[in-house]
Amino acid sequence: MMNHHYQQLVQKLEEISHLNGVMSTLGWDQEVMMPLGAGEARAKQISALAGGLHERMTDPALGDCLRVLQERNADAMGAVERCNIHEALRSYVLETKVPKRLVQELAELSSRGHGIWVMARQQNRFADFAPVLKRFLSLKKEWAHCVAPDSQPYDANIDLFERG
């Protein structure tokens, strides 16, 4: 029984990982190969993919699978499996606190903002980037309020990189 649930978890996490790989490839292409003028379309692609990823990462079936694995015979599993379950559950809990709309808007703005930043830097017109930065900070504050409403926005965001 445990083996079946763990295999389901691995299958779901592999699919998420593959989609994250596609996201990384789109980002790499944007930085290296993408032709000028394609930024708007790429931002929409990244937003759509971010939405699909979010749906998979917040799928109730994934949550059910994680809860079953966490509650039943955790001692019977190896350290690697327990760590995978712990990290997947941590990600699941975090992602379920954030609405899909916000995930997509952050992804789209980040992609679109990159092109604006590149042009602003080339032309030494950093004020052109200010509205993007202002909106991005506003969205990150909203994200922080979703995941940790009782914390400062900085603390909620830094916890992604420096836990604790």
Regions found by a protein language model. Give the residues of each.
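A well-structured
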Residues: 1-163
